[in-house]
Amino acid sequence: MASSPPIYNLEQYGTNCSEEYSNFYENSKYWIQCLWLIPTLFLLVWIIITTRVRYPSQYSNLPYWILTADCVVSIILILLDLFVVRLFLYFPQLCSKFSTIFINYPIISDIYFPIYNYARVFKTGSQCGMILSRLFCVLIPFGHDEKLRRHIPLFLTIICILPILVVWNTVISEKEVVFWYGGFFVIYHRRVGWVSLSKLHLTFIFVSISFILISSLLLMRHLPIESAVNAERRVITNSIFIIVAFFFQAAFQSFYAFFRYTDWYPRFLVDFQFIIYDVMTVGYPLIFLNFAKEFRNHVFLKSNRKGRTLMELRSMSKPFNNTMPRQESPSPNYDSILA
C-alpha cells in the first residue's frame, strides 16, 4: 500500500534547531501575543466562576452552558499555545533540549496535537449551538428555558462530538517534529490519506457560516417589535463578527489545503494563522459581554440597581402567538436572549 503524502512540503523545514534567527526577535513574537492571550485567559476563568459558582441558578439556561463549554475549551487552547505550541516555536533557546524530548517521547505529540486541533475546531460548532439556542428562544417564547434545559446534555454532547468528526485522523496518524524559525512544532502524516484536517475543517466552517446566516435571518424575522431595533442590532453585529472570523479561518484553510505543497507557500502564514484563530478566541467573549448587560455587570462586579435581573425578566415573560405579524407580537424580555 502506498503511503499517504505528508501534509507539508518538508523541504521547507530544517532538519535540526537553527541558530540563524535572533532570539530577541522570535521571543518578541511570543510576548506580543501574550498581551492578548493572558488577559483573555483570566477573563475566561472569571466567566466560568461567574456562571458556575457565583450565579449558577441565573445562568443555568442553554446559551450560558454553551458559553461555559466554549470558555473551558478556549482555556485549554490558550494554555497549549502559551506553554507548548507558541513557546517552542518562538523560543530558539529551548529548541535543542525540548525537541529531543518530543522526538524521544512521541506520546507527548500524540496527546497534545489532537487536543489542540480539537479545541480550534470546537468553536465552529459551539457558535452554531449558540445561535440555534437563541432562535429557539424567539420561536418558543413561552417556557423555552424549561424545554431547552431538559435537552442541555444532548446539545452539549452533540457540540462536543462534532469536532471529533474533523480531527479523528490526527489521533491515529503518525506525528513528526519539524523545525522552523529556530524553533519547532509538530505535524502529522495522514494514516487515512484522503481525510485531510484542513479540508474537513474548511467544509465544517462553510456549513457553519451558512447555518449562522440562515438562523440569524430567521431570528430577526421573528423578533417582536418592542425589542426589534436593539435586538436586531445585536444579532447583526454578533453574526457579522462570527462570520468574518470564520471567513478568515476559511481563507487560511483554503490557502493551506490547496497550496501547502508549493515551493512559494508563504512562510509568514505559520505566524499569521495564530492571529486568525485568536480573533475568535479573544473576540467572542468580549462580544458576548458587550451585548449582555446583566451578565457584564455580574462579571465586572458592577451594581445592577437600575437593571432588572434575569429572574425578574423571566417572571415578566409573556407568551405570544408566533404566527402573529411581527409588529403585533408582545414580549418584554427579548434583549436578554441575545446575550
Curated annotation (Swiss-Prot):
Q: So where does this one cross the membrane?
A: 30-50, 65-85, 98-118, 152-172, 200-220, 239-259, 268-288
Q: Name one GO cellular component term.
A: membrane
Return the Pfam families for the record.
Srg
Q: How does it sit in the membrane?
A: Multi-pass membrane protein
- Give this protein's Gene Ontology molecular function annotations: transmembrane signaling receptor activity
**Record flagged with keyword Ribosomal protein:** no
Give the superkingdom in one word.
Answer: Eukaryota
Q: Where is this region: Disordered?
A: 319-339
The record's InterPro entries line, in alphabetical order, gives: 7TM_GPCR_serpentine_rcpt_Srg (IPR000609), Nematode_SR-like (IPR051119)
For this UniProt record, the keywords arranged alphabetically read as follows: Membrane, Transmembrane, Transmembrane helix
Location(s) in or outside the cell: Membrane
Q: Give the primary localization class.
A: membrane
Q: Which GO terms describe its biological process?
A: sensory perception of chemical stimulus
The Swiss-Prot or TrEMBL record describes its family as follows: Belongs to the nematode receptor-like protein srg family.
Q: What is this protein called?
A: Serpentine receptor class gamma-7
